[in-house]
């Protein structure tokens, strides 16, 4: 089933809330990490099956380690393919990272932004696409260490891999913001100005934790981030992509800017992994996504007619 509109990540803690949603809710689809469900059974799987009968499913991988050196895990790929076939899922994305090195590392570690890494990751993406028999999408990740060997910036790296592998781009707006603030290398708005919008087919939005005080808002006119390539600038705060907080206003603003830049409005999902508030608060955030989508879809149509 095709994805559209606003969605919410399915978590076991939210199972009952998903099942209680009315048919006309603003939650149009749900997303799962396949690693959590390939071998899951019992009551948790029964509730998941009930939810999957009602909501189209996006599948977002955690462990393929597209940037890793070890051969791709064919057993995991087979499990992903079987899960997607069972639930008629038509969308799969994975992180631009690696998570194994002589063993599983249980974290998503960043790649050096180099031409060699572009070729390496793109080849592995092509292998995944051949195995699954479909185009996948690549998500930009948050990272906390910038490689000194990088020869390009983050958005150039993402675009180059997507073009080389002929894959989609899964845009994580919160990750763009977190990286922009933490590293001071790339204005989040400039990232969106340069991303290959023709390949963006899915969006994530989430909350982050401010470890050392609130971050100052970043805007397109911020001179400190004006150039697409810049020098490292130490910042007094650290943002951590936790998925455990409400979406910050700065990130909502960035999502709106993304919608303005894109030629279409992609399906957009709210991520929340822990520290769950009352479900009404999560629902309100999904509702806000839907409202922004409707607003900018209307503006896109009006602009086309004006042209």
Curated annotation (Swiss-Prot):
Protein family membership: Belongs to the UPF0276 family.
Pfam families, per the entry: MbnB_TglH_ChrH
PANTHER family xrefs: UPF0276 PROTEIN HI_1600
InterPro entries in the cross-refs: MbnB/TglH/ChrH, Xyl_isomerase-like_sf
SUPFAM superfamilies referenced in this protein's UniProt entry, alphabetically: Xylose isomerase-like (SSF51658)
Signal sequence coordinates: none
Stated name of the protein: UPF0276 protein PM0211
